[in-house]
């Protein structure tokens, strides 16, 4: 799922979305993640996704891929070594990878998580705090976790052109992140009106159906996305 630069000056940024195919039907995470969480398989699933992305991705420094990871994955003391080993077996540059941590998940060992993030960032990996603003953990995580991006929760973004409250929240979150040197990404952008407001607010990246719908990673084509963005700009 692509995140496009609102001011058209940043590199292309894509988020990997996980789907499970069963009898020709694509199942959304809401169908298979709860059982994985219940039986303790989420970390294993995260590692499988990382391995697959690292295997398929080639060096292109103008491309940044976001991979969602769970709090239990980040808590795991062996995660850092796993990433390094997987990296050595791939053609990936660390600068191409951004690990996304949802605010909605619990990071039990915050000190260990911070240490892991710092070590991986030193190598060039980047980190994003997802669903920013969705709960009470927002500002605590922003203070404690050394991230490069925050993704503003789509519930605030979706109708910001029709809601003064949403507009105020998005503007405040954007200013807070910017003041800390963190790049903002707006989720759930579904109309030109919302996109226009985000550009005025100076939000760096936008993600949503207005810009592009998710597609299989096998047909990732940067020129196609650039053409579509041009159509949105002129249409």
Protein language model features and the residues they cover:
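Mobile late-domain/C-terminal helix-loop "cap" segments
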Residues: 115
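EAL-family c-di-GMP phosphodiesterase catalytic domain
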Residues: 6, 10, 19-25, 70-77, ...
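Bacterial c-di-GMP phosphodiesterase EAL domain
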Residues: 1-91, 105, 118-119, 134, ...
């Amino acid at each position: 799922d692509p995140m496009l630069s609102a001011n058209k000056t940043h590199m292309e940024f894509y988020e990997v979305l996980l789907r499970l195919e069963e009898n020709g039907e694509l199942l959304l995470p809401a169908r298979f993640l709860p059982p994985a969480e219940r039986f303790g398989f989420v970390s294993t699933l995260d590692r499988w996704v990382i391995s697959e992305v690292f295997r398929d991705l080639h060096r292109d420094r103008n491309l940044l891929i976001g991979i969602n990871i769970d709090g239990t994955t980040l808590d795991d003391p062996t995660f850092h070594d796993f990433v390094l080993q997987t990296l050595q077996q791939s053609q990936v540059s660390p600068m191409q990878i951004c690990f996304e941590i949802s605010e909605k998940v619990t990071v039990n060992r915050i000190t260990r998580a911070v240490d892991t993030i710092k070590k991986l960032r030193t190598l060039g990996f980047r980190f994003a705090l997802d669903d920013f603003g969705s709960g009470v953990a927002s500002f605590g995580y922003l203070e404690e976790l050394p991230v490069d991006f925050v993704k503003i929760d789509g519930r605030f973004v979706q109708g910001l052109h029709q809601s003064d409250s949403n507009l105020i929240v998005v503007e405040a979150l954007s200013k807070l992140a910017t003041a800390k040197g963190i790049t903002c990404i707006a989720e759930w952008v579904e109309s030109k009106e919302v996109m226009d407001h985000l550009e005025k607010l100076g939000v760096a990246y936008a993600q949503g159906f207005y810009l592009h719908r998710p597609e299989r990673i096998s047909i990732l084509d940067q020129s196609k996305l650039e053409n579509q963005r041009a159509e949105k700009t002129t249409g």
